[in-house]
């Protein structure tokens, strides 16, 4: 995985009306490895490292929703996982951040 570009928007932008951090990534070989393929061990280790992820609602809009997304069917993509890790690291640092979006740039 490589970070291709990063930008910080301190005010309203075409991404949001509030400050955001934008990363453009190349997942490389990891693009073919959703969480379902990585297995529950990956998910469990991630939650152990960042327990606050257990509170992320994700698209289910309820605590545990993100964990549910990682475990259901084929799971979710690692770009989406990185989105939640970035949000949680900001929360651990004392910022009340909840907004994130992941998009594929095929």
Task: Pin down the residues of each PLM region.
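Charge-rich, well-structured scaffold segments of protease-associated domains
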Residues: 1-26, 88-106
């Amino acid at each position: 995985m490589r970070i291709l570009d990063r930008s910080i928007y301190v005010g309203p932008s075409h991404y949001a009306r509030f400050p955001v951090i934008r990363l453009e990534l190349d997942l490389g070989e990891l693009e073919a490895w959703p969480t379902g393929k990585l297995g529950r061990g990956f998910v469990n280790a991630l939650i152990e490292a960042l327990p606050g992820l257990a509170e992320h609602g994700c698209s289910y809009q309820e605590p545990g929703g993100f964990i549910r997304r990682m475990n259901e069917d084929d799971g979710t993509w690692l770009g989406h996982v990185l989105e939640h890790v970035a949000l949680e690291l900001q929360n651990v640092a004392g910022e009340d951040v909840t907004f994130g979006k992941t998009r594929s740039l095929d």
